[in-house]
């Protein structure tokens, strides 16, 4: 080759590199954002404590999945790097605003939120209730940290991006996708402390799955609603019903500033006599009480007419959470209680 042409070609390569040049096909690839929040998917084993600790940034996570470059351009947004047992109402509004901001970019096809599995069901539901974009948002995590040889994080990340790019991915709301299974945020729950097959949707079933050659959507969640994000989230306490309880925890919550109380009740939504009296005490003080069931499947319903039965609790002014878990009944209360504390109006949000 002519030395001048060779020099020009070399200079062109140098300039392309200095300007952030990429392979020609990259310009044709869609862009997916990864909003990283931390926890197991971003943890590695500490050599001193021999326990997993936060270690990986969002860039580190995406770099661990080389195949991502073949299907998408990835924009990383590091929101936090914390265990998900630190995640809650103090951080959820900022996370929702950040994800909404990222989704507003016309170049972004969708968002993957990396998160710990302990509170993933609640964070995803909060996002589902507050995000207004119809672009796909897929929340993922890992049951095995990045130091383990069979860590599930990279596969879950790749599957999430594939899901976002799939046909018909829009309009599904926030989903939780781990171990190939796609769950709706409203219905998903964690069922095992360590198994990678930990998330399912109970009676509602999976939305679909991410297979080797395609993404399959089998159904769509119809029970979705969007609520405004208030300037301040209220304090919502949660109290468990257990045999022999005297109801003092409900009374304490009512007297110490709780703006609503979720009761994790038995069966269809039943409590003992002492708890009944405590619930009525809170309601009489103008504090909404939401009855949810601790049972894995089924709904909390006002059925039984003896004292402490659901029928009597409803007549006392309680709201019933239907098939929402106690945790998710609380998430919905965070957004619905600032709008209304009136029984029928509040009940309408749980019936949607």
Q: Could you say what each language-model-derived stretch is?
A:
Residues 140-210:
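Internal gly/pro-rich beta-alpha loop/helix module
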Residues 27-102, 280, 297, 320:
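ATP/NTP phosphate-donor binding region
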Residues 28-30, 35-39, 57, 63-68, ...:
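Accessory alpha-helical/coil subdomains and C-terminal extensions
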Residues 9-20:
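Bacterial N-terminal signal peptides
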Residues 124-155, 162-165, 283-293:
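Short, acidic/small-residue loops that bind anionic groups at enzyme active sites
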Residues 20-26:
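Sec/Tat signal peptide C-region and signal peptidase I cleavage site
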Residues 273-352:
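ATP/nucleoside-binding phosphotransfer catalytic cores, i.e., glycine-rich phosphate-binding loops
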Residues 113-135, 271-280:
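Short Gly/Thr/Asp-enriched flexible loops that form oxyanion-binding sites at enzyme active sites
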